[in-house]
Amino acid sequence: MTRMTKSSSSLFDHIYPYIVITVTITIVFHNSLDCDFTFDDTSAIVQNRHVHTNETDWFRIFDVDYWGTPIRSEHSHKSYRPFTSLTFRWNHLWSPALNPYEFHLTNVLLHIIVSFICFEFLRIMLGPQNRWPACLFTLYFAIHPIKSEAVTSIVGRAELLSTLFILISLFCYFKNAYINFAITVLLASYSKEQGMTTPAICIAIECLKLMIQFKSLNYLPFWSRLWHSLSNLTMAKIIALIAYTALLIGTRIYLAGSSLPIFTKFDNPASFEETPSRQLTYNYLLPLNVRLMLWPRWLCADWTMNSIPLVKTFDDSRNAWTAIFYLVFIILSSRAFYLATSKQSKRLFNIEIDIERSNLLISLILIVIPFIPASNLLFPVGFVLAERILYTPSIGFTTLLAIGWLRIQNYFQRSRFIQFLLNFSTILMLVTFTFRTYERNFDWHNDLTLFKSGLMVNPNNAKLYNNIGHYYERRGEWSEAIKYFRLAADKDQEDIGAELNVARSLIRLNRLKDAEDLLWAIKPRVRTSILKNRMVPQYLNIWINLAHLISMNQTRLHEAENLYQEVLTIRSDFVDAYINLGELYIRKRLFDQAQETYEKALQRARHIDDGKRADIHYNLAIAKSLKLDHQQQKPSGSKLGSLLTEIAQDLMIAIDINREHREAIINLAILLQRPQFPSNNQNEYRTFAINALRSYSRSNELESFQFNIAITLLDIGGPTNRMDAIHHFKRAAELKPDFRSALYNLALLYYDFKDYEQSLFYLNRTLEHYSNYTKALLLTADIYSRMERLDDTEKVS
């Protein structure tokens, strides 16, 4: 009995930290399950057709960035996270209606798993005897308020997954499971770019081993010590890690088209400053990140634009915080190096490192290396501060605090008051964090609550006003949208985007004159901005918006054409200009010019978005079709067949690119019904059309699609296809009970099968809605005659 009790107690001691972690995270983050898709979730999931399982093939995710833009496009932010996007696709597979609940639940579960692994890591770093402190500081990691963005924002899954795989890969590496290490590093890198820092963490620890080995050979001459240190397995590991890192980075650069993303001064103002302002501001951001970890009172989803004033001179008082940060960092680093490289005896995994003396240095490595890519110190990034990017470095920060906590506890182990104070203050901190994180999750309930909470922290951030304006814009509340767009323009006079938003909303309110005057007023400023800064592709939309507005007046089409031509002189590969110019030519019945414009778009525009490429091929098919219909001398025979085939191929390309392109699908089905369509490979085209119609109908069931499937099946012919056609005609009639063509075709088919009762049933349904429909009346009379129901025949006649 005693043995069983001890065994049960031991088991409970082993699992209780996991129970505590799970219950705590569930309590703190359960309100995140009720949140909507917010902020970047919209572009990464809701509007990203590559996440929607019914629209594209899964492998297309590897061709696009996190937001669904082709990775090589200049419009791409170059955030390449295909594995994270695949998990969104899996969520969509489970919840085709795009219910955010499943997405949020997945994030919370992933956070629990990461916290479990963090607990195991802390147990190693603090020593297996310190389970309580390890559990305590795992809770610090798990419920810290900055985790709200990574967990409650669905796109924060990139941080969750990359951190998960980084930790697993470190365990694999130190267990000598190098193949598993390589695989998990790849998964970490394809979850988020910071995963590529994992080999660098291992390199830093291997370098620590080299230093220890070098010092242990102090009885040898310097060059002999150096040779012995470098000519061993440790050095081979470092070389292999460097090679693997180079391969990862090289592949990543190749996939991105060997170009960096284009950011504006509104994304990261310091990037556009001269020396020393740029460097002073970048370095000032370092203590601000530490402040977020130590005092997470002021949290905001967006710190861009004027949220943090630039540090322009050396006499700015904020430089004192930078100096304090570097002073503390140097002291900690010096102490860490001293402890790690002296009196080594124990082993970390299979590495001859005293974990008790090296844990301080390892914690600093885990803070610094994963943070470097987001620090602006190597290259500019598209944000100033971002709470989510601290998710991985916070493991190192948590370890650092836990080490300090243990040192204080051990130093004052005889003082009950200090011990009580230490435990009480720690628990108080965790309780405070619990309430703050729970409160912060409510900010992420929807876009409006999120951005309004941001204005409480950063009232000078014009982007937040713009985002609130977009929220009201999506709801059709145009006046309220204009109010916030104008507030954004007032906060930053250089923010041309806000004024473009105002103009767009004015158009929606039918205040066309006001919108046109505003667009003409800001057009010269856009040209100046293009000359001063790197070109912002979105600003070119002023020409599109202005031309579109002018083209509403049929007498001003020439002005609109000139605007499209003007913007193409600025950017000869501007796809939107080609698309709109082609549509303008179609309106002017200049079908040759329209065709030429669309062909030029396909030739000149690089890395076109899939949706736009599909639209161009569709528009090209329409231009060719209209050109054919309006020719005075219509071609005949093989020439006509060749032109119809060419049109069909353009439509098929559009459908191949975008399986949800409704217009292309329906026009292809109609085109194939033309009697002039060549018989060569006709069934192949019709089979393609049927598959496209069925694929679309699975998610967007429309009576017109069911009808066209049936007609195309009849064109292919054969008893099986005719029976299948009946099914689709019936479905069309169910979706639209007064669908005359579907009802009449059903009657015809049953007439052909000599099933006169069924034929009469559908004829009667047709005549209920269309009592004077001649064809139905004649067919009814014919059936009555065949059935020798002469009285009924006379009534119909």
Regions found by a protein language model. Give the residues of each.
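Polytopic membrane enzymes that build or remodel cell-surface glycoconjugates and lipids
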Residues: 2-527, 531-541, 545-547, 580
